Amino acid sequence: MTTANDAQQLISFIANAKKVTPVKVTYKGVLTGEIPATVQQFGGVSFGQLIGDWSEIQPLIAALPAENVFVENDARNSAVPLLDKKAVNARIEPGAIIRDQVTIGDNAVIMLGAVINIGAEIGSGTMIDMGAVLGGRAIVGEQSHIGAGAVLAGVIEPASAQPVRIGDHVLVGANAVVIEGVQVGDGAVVAAGAIVTKDVPANTVVAGVPAKIIKQIDSKTQQKTALIDALRGL
């Protein structure tokens, strides 16, 4: 079970991290001053590109005409970098936003537009569909499916609070919301649009607002909600 110490480590990481405003600057002209070691430079003396923190790059380009500078920037005083996805043994589609300190299991699938916050855990073979949101410390087991637009509420603070925990072989339908601290048991199905405010027993189907048990999993339900292994191959 996730402990308060785990949460406290994340809180400490965010609080103590150096806040950066990452930029990519294309410039034409002569820079002012020496380029810090923490800034990457590509190109020549009077034309090139700088990559680094705005606080270090801004003085270098301050004397250049505005028309000779193009700045690309998508964050301000950011405390948590994005995950380095190159070594992840999973399929991650363009447009997914995944913060650092996220764990992704083998053969998982992260679709376009998914947002996954710090401390989240995704089991092997699990699919996070388009536009789904996994809040801080949310946990999803193996071979599960989180539907498009679904939200697993995050809980970084208070540190003592329990995160959302989704079991193995669970299907969470499109646009469903699972509230902080709720646990969904193995093999359960959460219907599309449901708002889950209480724990869901294993092998049950819940639906509605708030979500209530409507039946036990049967063979017909299993056929309708079966996952396709071919979609998880690399």
From Swiss-Prot:
Its EC number is 2.3.1.89. Pfam families: DapH_N, Hexapep, Hexapep_2. SUPFAM superfamilies: Trimeric LpxA-like enzymes. It catalyses: (S)-2,3,4,5-tetrahydrodipicolinate + acetyl-CoA + H2O = L-2-acetamido-6-oxoheptanedioate + CoA. The keyword Acyltransferase applies. GO terms for molecular function: tetrahydrodipicolinate N-acetyltransferase activity. Pathway: Amino-acid biosynthesis; L-lysine biosynthesis via DAP pathway; LL-2,6-diaminopimelate from (S)-tetrahydrodipicolinate (acetylase route): step 1/3. GO terms for biological process: diaminopimelate biosynthetic process; lysine biosynthetic process via diaminopimelate. The keyword Amino-acid biosynthesis applies. Keywords: Acyltransferase, Amino-acid biosynthesis, Diaminopimelate biosynthesis, Lysine biosynthesis, Repeat, Transferase. InterPro entries: DapH, DapH_N, Hexapep, Hexapep_transf_CS, Trans_hexapeptide_repeat, Trimer_LpxA-like_sf. Belongs to the transferase hexapeptide repeat family. DapH subfamily. Catalyzes the transfer of an acetyl group from acetyl-CoA to tetrahydrodipicolinate. This is 2,3,4,5-tetrahydropyridine-2,6-dicarboxylate N-acetyltransferase. It comes from Leuconostoc citreum (strain KM20).
